[in-house]
């Protein structure tokens, strides 16, 4: 598996973007560019260990902790002690793990995974959804891009990702298939997740937190899966709902995702921005 260079753009406040399970940094391309174009953020979006283009995991099994270990090393190489961390799905789980280690200035979970305890039925429901997708995953490994020629392939590929089949472009769909076909983390992480709890220390989150819910999320539907975050995060955590989008909203609504991130980061950084640009007397 070839390792690719992470997305690294812009200058200003450090922002780390973490992608979902089975996918790669490519899901953040549009949002990363939009954040960098504000002129206020230095954006870093790596592909996590065991995923297409990421470093080898170095272990038989994967967990959010192991993934966070790899990301921490990358932050150290950048010279970033802390960053504003934004994660989607699995990336959201890893974002909270990094916050627990003191690496976050703020944390945003977009349709974040990990909102369960060890024996929560919702945990096994999510794992079951990924296991149910195993035949499609095996087809992508056998056929590669030819998978997209099969009947209903677009519908099946986009069902867990977007609010509608048209929410993902042909180029994005091709990248999704490539990512899924080259992701050893699939088995490594699912097996380990069966044995581990999710995010149990949300109440101790010590930085500003932002929960982004996706109305048409079919992987972690917000009506049932958001409660763990809204109940256990400290009072004052911001909650944003993106209407009409699925589990990976960066595909169908990158501008709205960027807007939600920037609005929250502006709230987090206002004092320092006022210090840099004091009002005219």
Description of each model-found segment:
Residues 7-55:
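Conserved HGGG/HGGXW glycine-rich cap/lid loop of the alpha/beta-hydrolase fold
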Residues 104-140:
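Flexible "cap/lid" loop of the alpha/beta hydrolase fold
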Residues 245-258:
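Catalytic histidine-centered segment of alpha/beta-hydrolase-like enzymes
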């Amino acid at each position: 598996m070839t390792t690719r260079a992470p997305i690294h753009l812009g200058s200003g406040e450090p922002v780390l973007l973490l992608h979902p399970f089975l996918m790669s940094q490519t899901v953040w391309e549009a949002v990363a560019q939009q954040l960098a174009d504000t002129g206020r953020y230095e954006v870093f979006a790596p592909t996590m260990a065991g995923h297409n283009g990421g470093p080898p995991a170095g272990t038989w099994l994967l967990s959010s902790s192991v993934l966070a270990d790899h990301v921490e090393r990358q932050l150290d190489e950048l010279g970033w002690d802390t960053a504003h961390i934004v994660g989607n799905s699995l990336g959201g789980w890893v974002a909270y793990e990094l916050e627990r280690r003191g690496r976050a200035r703020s944390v945003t979970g977009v349709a974040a995974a990990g909102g369960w305890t060890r024996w929560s039925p919702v945990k096994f429901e999510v794992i079951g959804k990924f296991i149910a997708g195993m035949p499609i995953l095996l087809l992508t490994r056998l056929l590669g891009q030819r998978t997209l020629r099969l009947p209903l392939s677009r519908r099946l590929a986009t069902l867990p990702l977007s609010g509608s089949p048209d929410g993902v472009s042909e180029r994005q769909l091709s990248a999704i298939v490539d990512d899924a076909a080259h992701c050893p983390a699939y088995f490594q992480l699912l097996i380990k997740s069966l044995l581990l709890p999710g995010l149990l220390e949300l109440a101790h989150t010590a930085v500003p937190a932002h929960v982004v819910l996706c109305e048409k999320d079919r992987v972690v539907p917000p009506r049932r899966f958001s409660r763990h975050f809204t109940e256990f995060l400290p009072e004052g955590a911001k909650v944003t709902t993106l209407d009409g989008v699925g589990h990976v909203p960066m595909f169908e609504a990158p501008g709205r995702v960027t807007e939600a991130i920037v609005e929250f980061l502006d709230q987090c950084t206002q004092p320092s921005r006022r210090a840099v640009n004091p009002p005219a007397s």
